[in-house]
Amino acid sequence: MSSTGTTLSASEGDKGFRNGAAPAKSKSHSTIALLRLLAFAATLSAFVTMITNKQKITIGPFTRWSKWHYSDAFMWFVVANCIAFIYLLFAAILGLISHSPMLVKHLVILDLIVSYMLFSAASAATAVAYIGKNGISQPGWTAICGVFERYCHHVAGALVACFLGWLFLTIAVFLGMRRSPAAV
């Protein structure tokens, strides 16, 4: 007999079932997989938005372009989002297929590393976007977002998507650590 007064068979007790309730781990697996899929969608969105982002302006005989690969920070942003969305797709699938404690531990650690990478890339890109919007008066760097307005709006959208992806992944890390505290 259990402490609640119900009788559990050995197989039910081993699986964590009590009064017909499903174990909490399966709900946790699904929640973490959902968070990874949301992070996947957000980072894929940020990636696609940035690689398709360009704007051309013509002033008299001069034509100027603004493209994501003109900035090292934006290149890092694109690469980090690409790595993240590929990893997140595989991690979500693996997390649903296998519930091995060793795999769970490795995925939590990899989730943490990818979340750091996303935060690093998004922060660097945010700094460049800030300068593009506001400029810096001392070295004479002028703001370009008044001229390349559409380009700057796309960068802002990609940054929001990336930070959302980071948030979803960070929540997944916390849930994964709670589920498997020996992972970290």
From Swiss-Prot:
One of its GO terms (cellular component) is plasma membrane. Residues 52-76, 133-154 are extracellular. It is found in: Cell membrane. It holds the Pfam family CASP_dom. It comes from the Eukaryota. It is a multi-pass membrane protein. Belongs to the Casparian strip membrane proteins (CASP) family. This is CASP-like protein 1U1. It comes from Marchantia polymorpha.
